[in-house]
Amino acid sequence: MRLSKMGYFLFKIKQKFVTHNHETICEFYRRGGVKVGKNNIICDYIPIGEPGLVEIKNDCVISSEVSLITHDHSINKVTDKGSNLFGRIVIGNNCFVGQRSTILYGVELADNIIVGSGSVVVSSFSESNIIIAGNPARKIGTWNEFREKYQEKAAFRTELDDIICGSIDKLVHK
């Protein structure tokens, strides 16, 4: 079964009349064939050609405009079979996939991986507690390094007005 944009659109309309929560979005993907664990947050519609080939384990955040591509039709150009290449995508426990990232077929991510925004993940990562980013994605750091660098700058959205009005040094500068 394909997850169509129209189906998602109708789902979102229905959702406006019920209590909004991320679990209902996850349920939409479960019904479509994606294996979705518990306590996940999926922020937006994710186009998935073959939902049965995707697994998102527990406690993950999938940001908006993420693409999970489970096939590659380009093989059709170099063979006369008219076929595709297919592969599973597995996102481990407690992973964060940044906005506009793409994960290609055959990729498995270990637990506790942060995928930087805009990354293109073309190969699997079996090491846990790392940060990957880029095109193609590569390891750029560890959770501990990330925590040490940014822990003092971490804030809740409810604190943002106070930061803007007074503690501007708490904002991240690159």
Each language-model region and where it sits:
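Conserved metal-binding segment of the jelly-roll/cupin
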Residues: R100, V115-G118
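Flexible, glycine/small-residue-enriched loop-and-beta-strand segment within the central core
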Residues: H22-R31, C43-L109, S124-S126, N135-P136, ...
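Short-chain dehydrogenase/reductase
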Residues: F96, I114, I131-A133
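Terminal amphipathic alpha-helical/low-complexity segments used for targeting or macromolecular assembly
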Residues: M1-G33, N135-K174
